């Protein structure tokens, strides 16, 4: 991501500048705006830091507690939120600071086979520690989230129809409804899994490779209390588009093998979560229209083939 450089003398909000200087209690050398409410702050002496705006004090405090406990229990592949600096409030955000890791020139990519395996191994290591952490976190409800997402997509039907044929839209909806019906009938199987603190947002940009080559997990904004399979499901959905035959190759990933006969997991894989999510976002901003259209139309046949294969596996398991 291109960083937009600013100094402490930049023509920004004077109230923000004043609060930042008071928070730091020293003058920064530079303040680089990375994105939205995230800044990189450097000093003449000492380590740089990241300044991030959280939606509430509770969210800052929850992540402060999580990262602290992770470090205490030996999980070091994430950042540490600075506890000696209490966050300051500005325009509805609570700004707190955390470690900055210089990134590697070689970015983490789901298209890379080794990266895919390393990423889910990191998730597993995180879960192995987080299952021993007692922390107040939201309880994740996959079915509720997906029903809301499908409902919103249906409301956006007339908007999507401007770009995609009704036949294709209806097919996406049909798979969404079929998936949810099967998922609801079988998700009780997941209650057998131990609850952990899940990451909740397994997008590629939340796996940061540091300059020393270490892969780290960042951004716990969507952390929740849930079975680890929720993170694995997200991960499987993210990497499936990079596999030639996802319905088969997903089960070659060690952490996913146990779910190849799990009906809830299989039904969930046939839910077009990315299609619904991206079109629902697009209705607010059309900047990514072309890429979402390609995913929905040009990627349609390949996705249908994957879903049909998964449906056959489900049918076979239901007969047993």
Listing of model-derived features with the role each one plays in the protein:
Residues 44-133:
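ATP-binding pocket architecture of kinase catalytic cores
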Residues 153-199, 309-320:
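An alpha-helical support segment within catalytic cores of ATP-dependent transferases
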Residues 1-26, 289-320:
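Regulatory N- and C-terminal appendages and interdomain linkers associated
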Residues 12-44, 57:
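ATP-binding glycine-rich phosphate-binding loop
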Residues 36-43, 50, 181-230:
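Active-site acidic catalytic loop and adjacent metal/ATP-binding pocket
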Residues 113-167:
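A cross-family kinase active-site recognition segment
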Residues 230-287, 298-306:
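Active-site activation/catalytic loop segments of kinase-like enzymes and analogous catalytic loops
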Residues 95-109, 132, 151-159, 276-287:
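A glycine-centered beta->alpha junction motif in the catalytic cores
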């Amino acid at each position: 991501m291109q960083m937009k450089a600013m100094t402490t003398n930049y023509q920004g909000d004077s109230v923000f500048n004043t609060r930042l200087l008071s928070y730091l209690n020293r003058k920064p050398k530079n303040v680089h705006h990375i994105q939205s409410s995230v800044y990189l702050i450097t000093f003449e002496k000492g380590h740089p830091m990241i300044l991030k705006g959280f939606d509430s004090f509770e969210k800052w405090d929850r992540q402060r507690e999580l990262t602290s406990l992770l470090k205490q229990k030996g999980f070091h592949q994430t950042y540490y939120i600075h506890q000696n600096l209490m966050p300051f409030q500005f325009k509805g955000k609570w700004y707190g600071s955390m470690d900055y890791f210089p990134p590697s020139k070689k970015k983490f990519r789901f298209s890379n086979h080794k990266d895919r395996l390393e990423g889910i191994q990191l998730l597993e290591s995180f879960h192995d520690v987080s299952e021993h952490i007692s922390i107040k976190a939201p309880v994740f409800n996959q079915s509720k989230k997906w029903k809301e997402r499908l409902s919103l997509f249906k409301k956006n039907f007339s908007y999507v129809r401007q770009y995609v044929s009704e036949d294709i839209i209806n097919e996406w909806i049909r798979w969404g409804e079929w998936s949810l019906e099967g998922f609801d009938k079988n998700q009780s199987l997941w209650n057998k899994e131990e609850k952990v603190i899940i990451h909740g947002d397994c997008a590629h940009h939340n796996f940061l490779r540091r300059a020393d080559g270490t892969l780290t997990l960042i951004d716990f904004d969507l952390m929740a209390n849930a079975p680890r399979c929720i993170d694995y499901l997200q991960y499987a959905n993210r990497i499936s588009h990079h596999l030639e035959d996802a319905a088969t190759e997903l089960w070659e990933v060690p952490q996913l093998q146990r779910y190849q006969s799990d009906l809830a997991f299989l039904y969930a894989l046939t839910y077009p979560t990315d299609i619904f999510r991206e079109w629902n976002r697009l209705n607010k901003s059309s900047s990514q229209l072309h890429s979402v259209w390609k995913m929905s139309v040009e990627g349609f046949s390949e996705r249908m083939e994957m879903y049909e294969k998964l449906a056959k596996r489900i049918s076979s398991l239901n007969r047993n």
